[in-house]
Regions:
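Active-site beta-loop-alpha junctions enriched in small/polar residues
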Residues: 22-26, 66-68, 98-102, 128, ...
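Conserved anion-binding
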Residues: 97, 101-198
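Active-site-adjacent beta->alpha loops and helix N-cap segments on the catalytic face
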Residues: 70-85, 102-107, 129-142, 204-213, ...
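Surface-exposed amphipathic alpha-helices with a cationic face
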Residues: 8-12, 83-87, 138-142, 182-186, ...
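Conserved, mostly hydrophobic/aromatic
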Residues: 19, 61, 96, 123, ...
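A C-terminal functional module that forms or caps the active site or interfaces directly
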Residues: 199, 203-249, 253-257
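Glycine-enriched alpha-helix->loop->beta-strand junction motifs that scaffold or abut catalytic
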Residues: 13, 58, 115-121, 142-148, ...
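Conserved N-terminal beta1-alpha1 strand-loop-helix module at the mouth
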Residues: 1-63, 68-81, 85-92, 262, ...
Length: 288
């Protein structure tokens, strides 16, 4: 069974919410911070409480490495400890690293994030140097069932600068990327009909959503953009297949939910936000 199979089953069991642990130190409630500990240690305490509170309603977690790199060595220890904390509760974890290099460098990235202190179940990758920026990760998919989510049509406004450009044959650049990755992924299919090579498909741009889902039916989607970036449940539902086939990420919306729920502890507020998000997406899917 591949990690993508396990993610599919996690979504079946708990829903498609992907909790983004993009944890900036400034997000921590002032009364939670222990002044005797480092920023990294406080972030790990925060993350662990949030993981424990949301693990029953989270399909997976996504840990954005930049928030940890910015703190230097203590941050990288916090990153490793956070990945470990997620893996210990048995929920799939995505390392949001967006690597995009080639050859030996990519081999080292793959080794660094699929083994050792920073081991994760999935990584995010940038494809624009070509398929040789993806291939060094594939042995880990073949031998260990590891998975990857490759940027295809992203949720940021600047996506239209490159991804939406038209090719001579009428396709967009994101179509070309998706087509090539979809073809490559057919050699790495799992038991539930999804490839180990997933796609990052932003939930803020809904143009041709139904066509994208139909065209890449073998590809599991990582769908950013919900909540703080403006993505709505009724739009995002179009990228799912009967409520599965993708995970929907929310980071700030969950991490900072306590600010919209006065008097509620941050971990309880995060749980409430996950439940609300899960129910909203399920309702939207039921209307399709």
């Amino acid at each position: 069974m591949t990690n993508m199979d396990k993610l599919y089953e996690a979504v079946e069991a708990r829903g498609p919410v992907c909790v983004g642990l993009d944890t900036d130190f400034s997000y921590l409630p002032e009364d939670f911070v222990d002044s005797t500990l480092s920023r990294g240690e406080n972030i790990v305490r925060f993350n662990k409480k949030l993981i424990d509170a949301t693990k029953a309603v989270a399909g997976c977690y996504k840990v954005q490495i930049a928030y940890y790199e910015s703190l230097g060595l203590e941050g990288m220890k916090a990153y490793a400890d956070t990945l470990k904390a997620v893996r210990e509760v048995g929920v799939p974890v995505i390392a949001d690293i967006k690597r995009g290099d080639i050859a030996k460098t990519a081999e080292m990235y793959a080794m660094g994030h699929f083994t050792g202190d920073f081991e994760s179940d999935f990584v995010t990758l940038a494809p624009y140097m070509g398929l040789d920026s993806i291939s060094p990760y594939l042995p880990y998919a073949e031998k260990q069932g590891k998975g990857m989510f490759v940027l295809c049509r992203t949720s940021n406004g600047g996506a239209k600068d490159f991804e939406y450009e038209k090719l001579a044959d009428g396709r967009h650049v994101y179509d070309l990327v998706g087509d090539k990755l979809n073809a490559l992924g057919k050699d790495y299919m799992g038991e539930h009909g999804y490839s180990s090579i997933g796609l990052v498909i932003g939930g803020t741009h809904i143009e041709e959503a139904t066509e994208i889902r139909a065209k890449y039916r073998d590809s599991f989607f990582l769908i950013p953009g919900y909540g703080a970036q403006g993505g709505k449940a009724e739009d995002i539902a179009q990228y799912l297949t009967k409520g599965n086939g993708g995970v929907v990420n929310s980071s700030r919306g969950i991490l900072l939910a306590y600010k919209k729920q006065p008097g509620t502890a941050f971990d309880e507020a995060a749980y409430n936000e996950c439940v609300n998000m899960k129910e909203a997406i399920a309702h939207a899917c039921s209307l399709l």
